[in-house]
Amino acid sequence: MSERPDLNELRGKLDEIDNSILDLLEERMAACRQIGNYKREHGMDVYDPSREEEKFKALEEIAGFESRPYVRELFKTLMDISKDHQNKPAFGVLGRTLAHTYSPEIHSLFDSSYSYSVIEREPEELEALFKSGVFKGFNVTIPYKKNACAMCDELDDASKTTGSVNTVLFEDGKVKGWNTDYFGFIYMLTRKGISVKDKKVLVLGTGGAASAVFYALKTLGAAETYACDLETDINYSNVYDRAGDAQVIVNCTPVGMFPKVDNSLLDLTRFPVLEACADVVYNPSRTKFLQEAEALGLKTCGGLAMLVAQAYKSSRIFAGDTAGAGLLGNPDSENGAAYVPAEAAELIEKVIKVLENRMRNITIIGMPGSGKSLLARNIAAVTGRTLVDLDIAFAEKFGRTPAEVISESGEDEFREMECEIAAEFLPKSGLVVSCGGGVVTRDVNKFYVRCNSNVFYLERPLTALTDKNRPISQLHGVEKLYEQRKDKYETWCDYKVSYDRFEEKNDFYNRAIADILGKLK
Protein backbone atom coordinates (compact mmCIF):
# COMPACT_ATOMS: atom_id res chain seq x y z
CA MET A 1 0.00 0.00 0.00
CA SER A 2 1.52 3.32 -1.09
CA GLU A 3 1.98 6.09 1.43
CA ARG A 4 -0.48 8.96 1.31
CA PRO A 5 1.13 12.37 0.66
CA ASP A 6 1.20 14.70 3.63
CA LEU A 7 -0.28 18.20 3.66
CA ASN A 8 3.02 19.98 3.03
CA GLU A 9 3.68 17.85 -0.07
CA LEU A 10 0.23 18.62 -1.43
CA ARG A 11 0.63 22.33 -0.77
CA GLY A 12 4.04 22.25 -2.44
CA LYS A 13 2.49 20.68 -5.53
CA LEU A 14 -0.22 23.35 -5.51
CA ASP A 15 2.42 26.08 -5.32
CA GLU A 16 4.18 24.63 -8.38
CA ILE A 17 0.90 24.54 -10.30
CA ASP A 18 0.07 28.13 -9.30
CA ASN A 19 3.49 29.30 -10.47
CA SER A 20 2.90 27.61 -13.83
CA ILE A 21 -0.53 29.24 -14.10
CA LEU A 22 1.02 32.62 -13.34
CA ASP A 23 3.61 32.17 -16.11
CA LEU A 24 0.88 31.24 -18.58
CA LEU A 25 -1.29 34.16 -17.46
CA GLU A 26 1.60 36.53 -18.20
CA GLU A 27 1.87 35.05 -21.71
CA ARG A 28 -1.89 35.31 -22.21
CA MET A 29 -2.10 38.95 -21.14
CA ALA A 30 0.80 39.84 -23.45
CA ALA A 31 -1.01 38.14 -26.35
CA CYS A 32 -4.22 40.00 -25.43
CA ARG A 33 -2.37 43.32 -25.52
CA GLN A 34 -1.06 42.49 -29.01
CA ILE A 35 -4.55 41.50 -30.16
CA GLY A 36 -5.89 44.81 -28.83
CA ASN A 37 -3.27 46.71 -30.84
CA TYR A 38 -4.17 44.72 -33.96
CA LYS A 39 -7.89 45.42 -33.52
CA ARG A 40 -7.24 49.15 -33.07
CA GLU A 41 -5.10 49.19 -36.21
CA HIS A 42 -7.85 47.49 -38.23
CA GLY A 43 -10.85 49.28 -36.71
CA MET A 44 -12.25 46.16 -35.01
CA ASP A 45 -14.29 46.03 -31.79
CA VAL A 46 -12.57 44.51 -28.78
CA TYR A 47 -15.68 42.59 -27.65
CA ASP A 48 -16.97 39.78 -29.89
CA PRO A 49 -19.83 38.06 -27.96
CA SER A 50 -20.39 35.24 -30.47
CA ARG A 51 -16.73 34.22 -30.40
CA GLU A 52 -16.75 34.37 -26.61
CA GLU A 53 -19.73 32.00 -26.36
CA GLU A 54 -18.12 29.58 -28.85
CA LYS A 55 -14.99 29.64 -26.73
CA PHE A 56 -16.89 28.80 -23.54
CA LYS A 57 -18.58 25.79 -25.15
CA ALA A 58 -15.34 24.48 -26.65
CA LEU A 59 -13.55 24.72 -23.31
CA GLU A 60 -16.37 22.97 -21.46
CA GLU A 61 -16.20 20.09 -23.94
CA ILE A 62 -12.49 19.43 -23.38
CA ALA A 63 -12.36 20.16 -19.64
CA GLY A 64 -11.83 17.34 -17.15
CA PHE A 65 -14.50 16.32 -14.65
CA GLU A 66 -12.86 18.21 -11.76
CA SER A 67 -12.75 21.56 -13.59
CA ARG A 68 -15.76 21.37 -15.95
CA PRO A 69 -18.31 22.88 -13.51
CA TYR A 70 -16.11 25.96 -13.09
CA VAL A 71 -14.80 26.51 -16.61
CA ARG A 72 -17.40 29.05 -17.75
CA GLU A 73 -17.15 31.15 -14.59
CA LEU A 74 -13.35 31.05 -14.60
CA PHE A 75 -12.94 31.98 -18.26
CA LYS A 76 -15.69 34.61 -18.08
CA THR A 77 -13.61 36.36 -15.43
CA LEU A 78 -10.45 35.84 -17.46
CA MET A 79 -12.00 37.26 -20.63
CA ASP A 80 -13.39 40.27 -18.77
CA ILE A 81 -9.89 40.98 -17.49
CA SER A 82 -8.51 40.49 -21.00
CA LYS A 83 -11.01 42.96 -22.49
CA ASP A 84 -10.06 45.49 -19.84
CA HIS A 85 -6.39 44.99 -20.72
CA GLN A 86 -7.10 45.43 -24.44
CA ASN A 87 -9.12 48.60 -23.84
CA LYS A 88 -6.36 50.39 -21.96
CA PRO A 89 -4.69 53.30 -23.76
CA ALA A 90 -1.78 51.84 -25.73
CA PHE A 91 1.74 53.18 -25.32
CA GLY A 92 5.16 51.62 -25.90
CA VAL A 93 8.82 52.10 -26.68
CA LEU A 94 9.88 52.71 -30.28
CA GLY A 95 13.24 51.57 -31.58
CA ARG A 96 14.87 49.35 -34.14
CA THR A 97 16.22 46.47 -32.01
CA LEU A 98 14.76 46.24 -28.51
CA ALA A 99 15.32 42.67 -27.35
CA HIS A 100 16.79 43.72 -24.00
CA THR A 101 14.71 46.80 -23.14
CA TYR A 102 13.52 47.25 -19.54
CA SER A 103 10.94 49.90 -20.46
CA PRO A 104 7.78 47.71 -20.36
CA GLU A 105 8.63 46.49 -16.87
CA ILE A 106 9.50 49.98 -15.63
CA HIS A 107 6.24 51.47 -16.88
CA SER A 108 4.18 48.62 -15.43
CA LEU A 109 5.70 49.41 -12.03
CA PHE A 110 4.87 53.12 -12.37
CA ASP A 111 1.31 53.00 -13.72
CA SER A 112 -1.13 50.23 -14.64
CA SER A 113 -3.69 52.52 -16.28
CA TYR A 114 -2.17 52.05 -19.74
CA SER A 115 -0.63 49.15 -21.66
CA TYR A 116 2.95 49.27 -22.89
CA SER A 117 4.44 47.44 -25.87
CA VAL A 118 7.75 47.03 -27.64
CA ILE A 119 7.48 48.74 -31.05
CA GLU A 120 10.25 47.70 -33.43
CA ARG A 121 10.21 49.52 -36.76
CA GLU A 122 12.52 50.11 -39.71
CA PRO A 123 13.19 53.75 -40.72
CA GLU A 124 10.84 53.58 -43.70
CA GLU A 125 7.99 52.48 -41.39
CA LEU A 126 8.09 55.48 -39.05
CA GLU A 127 5.74 57.75 -41.00
CA ALA A 128 3.05 55.06 -41.16
CA LEU A 129 3.39 54.39 -37.43
CA PHE A 130 2.95 58.07 -36.56
CA LYS A 131 -0.21 58.20 -38.69
CA SER A 132 -1.67 54.83 -37.66
CA GLY A 133 -3.55 55.88 -34.53
CA VAL A 134 -2.78 52.53 -32.88
CA PHE A 135 -0.82 54.10 -30.04
CA LYS A 136 -1.63 57.17 -27.97
CA GLY A 137 2.09 57.78 -27.65
CA PHE A 138 5.43 56.13 -27.06
CA ASN A 139 8.92 56.52 -25.78
CA VAL A 140 11.60 56.74 -28.45
CA THR A 141 15.08 55.28 -28.21
CA ILE A 142 18.11 54.84 -30.46
CA PRO A 143 18.19 55.46 -33.42
CA TYR A 144 14.94 57.42 -33.82
CA LYS A 145 15.07 60.33 -31.34
CA LYS A 146 15.96 62.92 -33.98
CA ASN A 147 13.44 61.45 -36.45
CA ALA A 148 10.72 61.75 -33.82
CA CYS A 149 11.70 65.35 -33.14
CA ALA A 150 11.21 66.22 -36.81
CA MET A 151 7.74 64.61 -36.85
CA CYS A 152 6.36 66.55 -33.86
CA ASP A 153 4.07 69.58 -34.12
CA GLU A 154 4.87 70.83 -30.61
CA LEU A 155 8.09 70.46 -28.61
CA ASP A 156 9.15 71.22 -25.06
CA ASP A 157 12.19 73.42 -24.52
CA ALA A 158 14.52 70.47 -23.93
CA SER A 159 13.53 68.89 -27.25
CA LYS A 160 13.93 72.17 -29.13
CA THR A 161 17.38 72.72 -27.65
CA THR A 162 18.68 69.17 -28.07
CA GLY A 163 16.90 68.34 -31.33
CA SER A 164 16.00 65.02 -29.71
CA VAL A 165 12.64 63.60 -28.56
CA ASN A 166 12.24 60.53 -26.37
CA THR A 167 8.55 60.91 -25.45
CA VAL A 168 5.72 61.35 -27.97
CA LEU A 169 2.04 61.97 -27.24
CA PHE A 170 -0.78 62.12 -29.80
CA GLU A 171 -3.27 64.63 -28.41
CA ASP A 172 -5.86 67.03 -29.86
CA GLY A 173 -4.85 66.12 -33.40
CA LYS A 174 -1.23 67.06 -32.79
CA VAL A 175 2.02 65.21 -32.26
CA LYS A 176 3.65 66.50 -29.08
CA GLY A 177 7.23 65.78 -28.10
CA TRP A 178 9.28 65.91 -24.91
CA ASN A 179 12.81 65.10 -23.90
CA THR A 180 12.74 63.57 -20.42
CA ASP A 181 16.31 62.22 -20.55
CA TYR A 182 17.70 65.45 -19.15
CA PHE A 183 15.46 65.13 -16.06
CA GLY A 184 16.66 61.54 -15.62
CA PHE A 185 20.23 62.81 -15.60
CA ILE A 186 19.42 65.54 -13.08
CA TYR A 187 17.81 62.97 -10.80
CA MET A 188 20.77 60.60 -11.21
CA LEU A 189 23.19 63.29 -9.98
CA THR A 190 20.99 64.65 -7.21
CA ARG A 191 20.28 61.31 -5.51
CA LYS A 192 24.02 60.81 -5.04
CA GLY A 193 24.69 64.34 -3.81
CA ILE A 194 26.67 65.38 -6.90
CA SER A 195 26.48 69.12 -7.60
CA VAL A 196 27.64 70.70 -10.86
CA LYS A 197 26.69 74.28 -10.02
CA ASP A 198 29.59 76.64 -10.77
CA LYS A 199 31.81 73.66 -11.67
CA LYS A 200 33.72 72.57 -14.75
CA VAL A 201 32.25 69.43 -16.31
CA LEU A 202 33.82 67.17 -18.94
CA VAL A 203 31.37 65.17 -21.07
CA LEU A 204 32.63 62.13 -22.99
CA GLY A 205 30.71 61.59 -26.23
CA THR A 206 28.60 63.79 -28.51
CA GLY A 207 25.58 61.59 -29.26
CA GLY A 208 21.94 61.85 -28.22
CA ALA A 209 22.60 61.13 -24.55
CA ALA A 210 25.27 63.83 -24.48
CA SER A 211 22.89 66.47 -25.86
CA ALA A 212 20.44 65.82 -23.00
CA VAL A 213 23.30 65.91 -20.50
CA PHE A 214 24.58 69.26 -21.79
CA TYR A 215 21.06 70.68 -21.49
CA ALA A 216 20.81 69.40 -17.91
CA LEU A 217 24.23 70.81 -17.01
CA LYS A 218 23.18 74.24 -18.27
CA THR A 219 19.92 73.94 -16.35
CA LEU A 220 21.84 73.11 -13.16
CA GLY A 221 24.22 76.04 -13.54
CA ALA A 222 27.50 74.37 -14.50
CA ALA A 223 30.22 77.01 -14.92
CA GLU A 224 31.84 75.46 -17.98
CA THR A 225 31.30 72.30 -20.03
CA TYR A 226 33.73 70.49 -22.30
CA ALA A 227 32.85 67.97 -25.01
CA CYS A 228 35.39 65.22 -25.63
CA ASP A 229 35.16 62.70 -28.45
CA LEU A 230 37.27 61.26 -31.25
CA GLU A 231 36.81 64.19 -33.62
CA THR A 232 36.06 67.15 -31.33
CA ASP A 233 38.54 69.92 -30.51
CA ILE A 234 39.09 68.22 -27.17
CA ASN A 235 39.84 64.57 -27.87
CA TYR A 236 41.34 61.63 -26.02
CA SER A 237 44.86 62.68 -26.98
CA ASN A 238 44.75 66.22 -25.59
CA VAL A 239 42.01 65.98 -22.97
CA TYR A 240 44.42 66.08 -20.02
CA ASP A 241 45.95 69.33 -21.27
CA ARG A 242 42.71 70.96 -22.41
CA ALA A 243 40.31 69.79 -19.68
CA GLY A 244 42.56 68.61 -16.86
CA ASP A 245 40.80 71.00 -14.47
CA ALA A 246 37.47 69.16 -14.78
CA GLN A 247 35.69 68.69 -11.46
CA VAL A 248 33.00 66.32 -12.77
CA ILE A 249 33.27 63.83 -15.65
CA VAL A 250 30.24 62.28 -17.38
CA ASN A 251 30.53 59.27 -19.70
CA CYS A 252 27.90 59.43 -22.46
CA THR A 253 29.56 56.82 -24.68
CA PRO A 254 28.81 53.07 -24.78
CA VAL A 255 32.37 52.31 -23.64
CA GLY A 256 32.22 49.88 -20.72
CA MET A 257 28.75 48.59 -21.61
CA PHE A 258 28.05 44.84 -21.47
CA PRO A 259 29.46 42.67 -22.98
CA LYS A 260 32.62 44.77 -23.53
CA VAL A 261 32.94 45.68 -19.87
CA ASP A 262 36.75 45.85 -19.64
CA ASN A 263 37.13 49.25 -21.26
CA SER A 264 37.47 52.72 -19.76
CA LEU A 265 38.40 55.89 -21.63
CA LEU A 266 40.49 57.96 -19.23
CA ASP A 267 43.19 57.87 -16.59
CA LEU A 268 41.31 59.58 -13.78
CA THR A 269 44.46 60.15 -11.75
CA ARG A 270 45.40 62.88 -14.25
CA PHE A 271 42.51 65.10 -13.15
CA PRO A 272 43.82 66.65 -9.92
CA VAL A 273 40.63 68.48 -8.85
CA LEU A 274 38.16 65.79 -9.90
CA GLU A 275 35.27 65.32 -7.43
CA ALA A 276 32.73 63.05 -9.10
CA CYS A 277 32.06 60.74 -12.07
CA ALA A 278 28.74 59.83 -13.68
CA ASP A 279 28.09 57.12 -16.27
CA VAL A 280 24.90 56.86 -18.33
CA VAL A 281 25.66 53.15 -18.93
CA TYR A 282 23.48 50.97 -16.67
CA ASN A 283 24.63 47.48 -17.66
CA PRO A 284 26.84 46.61 -15.85
CA SER A 285 25.66 48.57 -12.84
CA ARG A 286 29.21 49.40 -11.73
CA THR A 287 31.27 50.07 -14.85
CA LYS A 288 35.05 50.07 -14.92
CA PHE A 289 34.93 53.87 -15.17
CA LEU A 290 32.87 54.09 -11.97
CA GLN A 291 34.93 51.54 -10.07
CA GLU A 292 38.11 53.42 -10.95
CA ALA A 293 36.46 56.58 -9.62
CA GLU A 294 35.36 54.81 -6.43
CA ALA A 295 38.93 53.62 -5.86
CA LEU A 296 40.01 57.29 -5.84
CA GLY A 297 37.36 58.18 -3.27
CA LEU A 298 35.21 60.12 -5.75
CA LYS A 299 31.42 60.35 -5.75
CA THR A 300 29.83 58.19 -8.44
CA CYS A 301 26.46 57.48 -10.01
CA GLY A 302 25.35 54.96 -12.65
CA GLY A 303 22.82 55.09 -15.46
CA LEU A 304 20.00 52.97 -14.04
CA ALA A 305 18.66 55.90 -12.01
CA MET A 306 18.63 58.04 -15.16
CA LEU A 307 16.73 55.35 -17.07
CA VAL A 308 14.10 54.97 -14.36
CA ALA A 309 13.66 58.68 -13.59
CA GLN A 310 13.19 59.69 -17.22
CA ALA A 311 10.62 56.91 -17.53
CA TYR A 312 8.77 58.27 -14.51
CA LYS A 313 8.40 61.69 -16.13
CA SER A 314 7.21 60.00 -19.34
CA SER A 315 4.70 57.94 -17.36
CA ARG A 316 3.16 61.14 -15.97
CA ILE A 317 2.74 62.45 -19.51
CA PHE A 318 1.17 59.18 -20.65
CA ALA A 319 -1.19 59.19 -17.64
CA GLY A 320 -2.43 62.69 -18.54
CA ASP A 321 -0.54 64.59 -15.85
CA THR A 322 1.45 66.86 -18.16
CA ALA A 323 1.32 69.67 -15.60
CA GLY A 324 2.92 67.45 -12.96
CA ALA A 325 5.49 66.21 -15.46
CA GLY A 326 6.33 69.81 -16.34
CA LEU A 327 7.46 70.50 -12.77
CA LEU A 328 10.14 67.80 -12.96
CA GLY A 329 13.48 69.27 -14.02
CA ASN A 330 11.98 72.75 -14.44
CA PRO A 331 14.52 75.49 -13.57
CA ASP A 332 11.71 78.06 -13.34
CA SER A 333 9.79 76.16 -10.68
CA GLU A 334 9.76 77.52 -7.16
CA ASN A 335 11.91 74.65 -5.83
CA GLY A 336 14.43 74.49 -8.68
CA ALA A 337 15.27 71.96 -11.39
CA ALA A 338 16.46 69.25 -9.01
CA TYR A 339 13.23 69.20 -6.99
CA VAL A 340 11.20 65.99 -6.99
CA PRO A 341 8.10 65.57 -4.79
CA ALA A 342 8.70 63.08 -1.97
CA GLU A 343 6.02 60.67 -3.21
CA ALA A 344 7.52 60.63 -6.71
CA ALA A 345 11.06 60.16 -5.39
CA GLU A 346 9.91 57.27 -3.21
CA LEU A 347 8.33 55.52 -6.20
CA ILE A 348 11.36 56.12 -8.43
CA GLU A 349 13.67 54.71 -5.75
CA LYS A 350 11.44 51.67 -5.33
CA VAL A 351 11.59 50.89 -9.05
CA ILE A 352 15.36 51.44 -9.13
CA LYS A 353 15.73 48.93 -6.29
CA VAL A 354 13.52 46.34 -8.02
CA LEU A 355 15.43 46.57 -11.29
CA GLU A 356 18.85 46.75 -9.69
CA ASN A 357 18.25 43.59 -7.70
CA ARG A 358 16.81 41.81 -10.72
CA MET A 359 19.71 42.77 -12.98
CA ARG A 360 22.50 42.15 -10.51
CA ASN A 361 23.82 38.70 -9.71
CA ILE A 362 23.72 37.34 -6.18
CA THR A 363 27.43 36.59 -5.79
CA ILE A 364 28.85 34.79 -2.76
CA ILE A 365 32.47 35.05 -1.65
CA GLY A 366 34.19 33.65 1.43
CA MET A 367 36.63 31.10 2.75
CA PRO A 368 36.98 27.62 1.20
CA GLY A 369 34.69 25.15 2.91
CA SER A 370 32.30 27.79 4.28
CA GLY A 371 29.28 26.43 2.39
CA LYS A 372 29.17 28.87 -0.52
CA SER A 373 28.38 26.30 -3.21
CA LEU A 374 25.48 24.65 -1.42
CA LEU A 375 24.11 28.00 -0.28
CA ALA A 376 24.22 29.30 -3.86
CA ARG A 377 22.48 26.14 -5.08
CA ASN A 378 19.69 26.63 -2.54
CA ILE A 379 19.27 30.32 -3.38
CA ALA A 380 19.05 29.47 -7.09
CA ALA A 381 16.36 26.87 -6.34
CA VAL A 382 14.32 29.35 -4.30
CA THR A 383 14.63 32.28 -6.72
CA GLY A 384 14.57 30.42 -10.04
CA ARG A 385 17.81 32.09 -11.09
CA THR A 386 20.50 30.30 -13.05
CA LEU A 387 23.28 28.91 -10.85
CA VAL A 388 26.95 29.36 -11.76
CA ASP A 389 29.52 27.70 -9.52
CA LEU A 390 32.81 29.10 -10.78
CA ASP A 391 34.74 25.97 -9.76
CA ILE A 392 32.37 23.80 -11.79
CA ALA A 393 32.47 26.27 -14.70
CA PHE A 394 36.28 26.11 -14.49
CA ALA A 395 36.28 22.32 -14.88
CA GLU A 396 33.80 22.46 -17.76
CA LYS A 397 35.85 25.05 -19.64
CA PHE A 398 39.34 23.64 -19.11
CA GLY A 399 38.63 19.92 -18.70
CA ARG A 400 40.44 19.82 -15.34
CA THR A 401 39.28 20.63 -11.83
CA PRO A 402 40.91 23.47 -9.88
CA ALA A 403 42.55 20.87 -7.60
CA GLU A 404 44.03 19.04 -10.60
CA VAL A 405 45.45 22.24 -12.12
CA ILE A 406 46.98 23.28 -8.79
CA SER A 407 48.52 19.84 -8.33
CA GLU A 408 49.85 19.57 -11.89
CA SER A 409 50.70 23.17 -12.82
CA GLY A 410 50.82 25.19 -9.62
CA GLU A 411 48.66 27.84 -8.00
CA ASP A 412 49.80 30.74 -10.20
CA GLU A 413 48.62 29.08 -13.40
CA PHE A 414 45.35 28.14 -11.71
CA ARG A 415 44.76 31.77 -10.65
CA GLU A 416 45.32 33.03 -14.20
CA MET A 417 42.78 30.52 -15.50
CA GLU A 418 40.38 31.43 -12.68
CA CYS A 419 40.53 35.08 -13.80
CA GLU A 420 39.26 33.99 -17.24
CA ILE A 421 36.25 32.32 -15.65
CA ALA A 422 35.50 35.37 -13.50
CA ALA A 423 35.66 37.63 -16.57
CA GLU A 424 33.35 35.31 -18.52
CA PHE A 425 30.50 34.91 -16.02
CA LEU A 426 30.45 37.71 -13.47
CA PRO A 427 29.55 40.58 -15.86
CA LYS A 428 26.32 38.74 -16.79
CA SER A 429 22.97 39.52 -15.15
CA GLY A 430 20.50 37.76 -12.90
CA LEU A 431 22.65 34.79 -11.85
CA VAL A 432 23.50 33.21 -8.52
CA VAL A 433 27.29 32.87 -8.45
CA SER A 434 29.47 30.93 -6.04
CA CYS A 435 33.09 32.11 -6.24
CA GLY A 436 36.15 30.11 -5.30
CA GLY A 437 37.57 31.11 -1.95
CA GLY A 438 40.73 32.51 -3.53
CA VAL A 439 39.07 34.71 -6.15
CA VAL A 440 40.12 37.69 -4.01
CA THR A 441 43.84 36.86 -4.36
CA ARG A 442 43.94 38.57 -7.77
CA ASP A 443 43.05 42.26 -7.65
CA VAL A 444 41.86 42.20 -11.27
CA ASN A 445 38.92 40.05 -10.14
CA LYS A 446 37.56 42.80 -7.91
CA PHE A 447 36.16 44.60 -10.94
CA TYR A 448 34.41 41.47 -12.21
CA VAL A 449 33.05 40.44 -8.81
CA ARG A 450 31.57 43.89 -8.19
CA CYS A 451 30.62 45.06 -11.69
CA ASN A 452 27.16 43.51 -11.84
CA SER A 453 26.56 41.82 -8.49
CA ASN A 454 25.21 42.26 -5.03
CA VAL A 455 28.21 40.68 -3.31
CA PHE A 456 27.73 38.69 -0.09
CA TYR A 457 30.62 37.67 2.12
CA LEU A 458 29.71 34.43 3.89
CA GLU A 459 31.66 34.41 7.15
CA ARG A 460 31.83 31.23 9.23
CA PRO A 461 33.91 30.23 12.26
CA LEU A 462 37.22 28.74 11.15
CA THR A 463 36.39 25.62 13.16
CA ALA A 464 33.33 25.09 10.93
CA LEU A 465 35.38 25.03 7.71
CA THR A 466 36.46 21.86 5.95
CA ASP A 467 39.69 21.50 3.95
CA LYS A 468 38.67 18.22 2.29
CA ASN A 469 39.57 18.35 -1.44
CA ARG A 470 40.93 21.89 -0.93
CA PRO A 471 44.66 21.80 -1.72
CA ILE A 472 45.35 25.48 -0.94
CA SER A 473 43.78 25.16 2.51
CA GLN A 474 45.74 21.96 3.15
CA LEU A 475 49.01 23.55 2.00
CA HIS A 476 48.83 26.86 3.86
CA GLY A 477 46.37 26.15 6.68
CA VAL A 478 42.94 27.70 7.17
CA GLU A 479 44.09 30.28 9.74
CA LYS A 480 46.85 31.66 7.51
CA LEU A 481 44.55 31.86 4.48
CA TYR A 482 41.95 33.71 6.52
CA GLU A 483 44.48 36.32 7.67
CA GLN A 484 45.63 36.82 4.09
CA ARG A 485 42.14 37.21 2.65
CA LYS A 486 39.79 38.60 5.30
CA ASP A 487 40.37 42.29 4.47
CA LYS A 488 39.56 41.70 0.81
CA TYR A 489 36.44 39.73 1.65
CA GLU A 490 35.34 42.72 3.74
CA THR A 491 36.13 45.40 1.15
CA TRP A 492 34.86 43.54 -1.91
CA CYS A 493 31.43 42.72 -0.49
CA ASP A 494 28.25 44.78 -0.27
CA TYR A 495 26.90 42.73 2.63
CA LYS A 496 28.47 40.44 5.21
CA VAL A 497 26.43 37.54 6.59
CA SER A 498 28.01 35.80 9.59
CA TYR A 499 26.92 32.53 11.18
CA ASP A 500 28.17 30.29 13.96
CA ARG A 501 27.67 26.55 13.96
CA PHE A 502 24.19 25.11 13.51
CA GLU A 503 23.04 21.73 14.77
CA GLU A 504 21.40 21.03 11.42
CA LYS A 505 22.73 22.06 8.00
CA ASN A 506 19.23 22.95 6.84
CA ASP A 507 18.91 25.45 9.69
CA PHE A 508 22.04 27.23 8.44
CA TYR A 509 20.90 27.33 4.83
CA ASN A 510 17.36 28.44 5.67
CA ARG A 511 18.66 31.25 7.87
CA ALA A 512 21.25 32.37 5.31
CA ILE A 513 18.76 32.35 2.42
CA ALA A 514 16.26 34.39 4.44
CA ASP A 515 18.93 36.91 5.43
CA ILE A 516 20.36 37.32 1.92
CA LEU A 517 17.02 37.66 0.15
CA GLY A 518 15.81 39.95 2.92
CA LYS A 519 18.62 42.39 2.21
CA LEU A 520 17.52 42.62 -1.41
CA LYS A 521 13.95 43.68 -0.70
Enumerate the language-model features and the residues they cover.
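A glycine- and Lys/Arg-enriched "phosphate-lid" helix/loop adjacent to the NTP-binding pocket
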Residues: 451-488, 492
